[in-house]
C-alpha cells in the first residue's frame, strides 16, 4: 500500500497507475473468493508482483494454460521481468509480440487455465487497452541488474576487471559452446524461438516444441533454469546443453562457462 509514497517523484502518473495495477489482486483459478479454490481462505486473488516480486521472480511454477488435452500441459517457471523493455517475444510458447498483449491475455488465459467459463464464475477482470498500456509502461521501466564486469556498450567482459577463468568461459561461450548463436550480446538473447528437439533422447514423448530464447543477463539471480525449471543450477543448465547439443565440454570448460555467466 506504500507504492505511491515510494515512487511518486520517480515515476510518471501513467507509470504509477501501471504499478497500481501490477499490485492489485485479481481473482485467479486457484485463488479467489468462491468455494472452488485451492487456498484454504478466500481471497480477492493474486497480484502480478506476487510472483514477479519487485519486477523479478519468486521462482514459482505453474502449468501452461493453453495445451489440450490437459495431461499434456507442461510446467513453466516464473521468469524475471528484468530487462523486459528490450524483449520482443513474451510467453515461453505463445509468442506474443508485445507487453500489452501479454498483460491482457495473461488475465484471460493463464489466470484461469484458458477456461473462460471458470473465469466469469470466479470474477475475471476484463482490462481495457488503456489499463493494459499503463501496466506495460511500468513493466518497460524494469532494467537489467548491474553487471560491473561487462562493457556497457558491447556487453562483453572488460579484460581489466575479469578473472582468467571468466575470460576462458567467455571464449567458450562465443566459441565451441555455441551459446552466442542464440544468446547474443549485449542483451544475450536473439528475440527468436528455437526447438531443441529433446524428444530425440526420450521415448514416447513429444518434446517441448519451439521455446523462446530467454535473456542471460542477471541469470545468476533467477534459479531454477530453462523454461520449466528442470535445471536447478547453472551447472545443471550447462550440462543439459552439453548433452543435448553434444558439445563434449571438459569439466574445466564447464566450470569456466559458469564463471562467465555469473558475471552477466
Where are these regions (language model features)?
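Periplasmic c-type cytochrome electron-transfer domains
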Residues: 1-264
